[in-house]
Regions:
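N-terminal signal peptide c-region/cleavage motif recognized by signal peptidases
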Residues: 16-18
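A residue-level marker of the well-folded mature domains of exported/periplasmic proteins
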Residues: 3, 9, 20-182
């Protein structure tokens, strides 16, 4: 988690450089939710980086994971408040594209965090974990922890079709040495 928080802070600092002509750069951070501990830490890291660089951080999130409309509203509000750079963990990699296009048409830099958009070139940049590799590592850890003992593994896909979940899932199976659900 420290690495992701650090990457978020680095992205925030890079984004702030694009807005240095202003007295105080205005940067937005939109997460999937405000309750997930990962996104809470991401916001804390961004707030620390913004304070250190004298930037104003605006933050927003969907009400729940998957709330694209909430993310669109947050993006529109941030643009209206003068944000020149917005970092976002898109809840829906396709549905957010029209809002991103509008923002970029207004000269706002958009950086996707952790979850790529579809198409990937809809944003100016992507800072992300290698989610497949993360899944492989978790699968390998699980296999080692089981030490050859039989186990029944169940995986839940709360957001079917989301690339991050699919990559982690497939990596996990690979790390366990499984080729299918059988």
């Amino acid at each position: 988690m420290f690495t992701k928080t650090s990457l978020t802070a680095a992205a925030l600092l890079m984004a702030g450089g694009a807005a240095l002509a202003q007295t105080q750069p205005v940067i937005g951070l939109i997460t999937k939710t405000e309750t997930n501990p990962f996104f809470v830490k991401m916001k804390e890291g961004a707030a620390e980086a913004a304070k250190a660089k004298g930037a104003k951080l605006l933050s927003g999130a969907g009400k729940t994971d998957g709330d694209n409309a909430g993310q669109v509203t947050a993006m529109e509000n941030m643009i209206a408040a003068g944000a020149k750079t917005i970092l976002i963990t898109p809840s829906d990699s396709k549905a957010i594209i029209p809002a991103i296009k509008k923002a970029r048409d207004k000269g706002v830099m958009i950086i996707a965090l952790d979850s790529p958009t579809d198409p990937a070139d809809a944003t100016d940049a992507l800072f992300a974990t290698d989610n497949y590799k993360a899944g492989v590592l978790i699968g390998q850890y699980t296999k080692a922890a089981l030490a050859g003992k039989p186990a029944k593994i169940v995986t839940l896909d709360l957001f079917p079709g989301h690339p991050v979940g699919a990559q982690r899932h497939n990596g996990f199976l690979q790390g366990l040495g499984l080729q299918s659900f059988d």
